[in-house]
């Protein structure tokens, strides 16, 4: 059997990136809570261009 985690940067950014978080109300809630907590990295997108 293969390992269950098959990493792909495209899938990662499409599912957990900033633009995909902004699309839904729940995603915006995630961003708001991470901002309130003071996270330096809001989404996985911040690893690449910030």
UniProtKB/Swiss-Prot annotation:
GO terms for biological process: translation. Gene3D superfamilies: 1.10.287.3980. It holds the Pfam family Ribosomal_L34. GO terms for cellular component: ribonucleoprotein complex; ribosome. Signal peptide: none annotated. Residues 9-22 have a biased composition (Basic residues). It comes from the Bacteria. PANTHER family: LARGE RIBOSOMAL SUBUNIT PROTEIN BL34M (PTHR14503:SF4), MITOCHONDRIAL RIBOSOMAL PROTEIN 34 FAMILY MEMBER (PTHR14503). Belongs to the bacterial ribosomal protein bL34 family. HAMAP family: Ribosomal_bL34. This is Large ribosomal subunit protein bL34. It comes from Azobacteroides pseudotrichonymphae genomovar. CFP2.
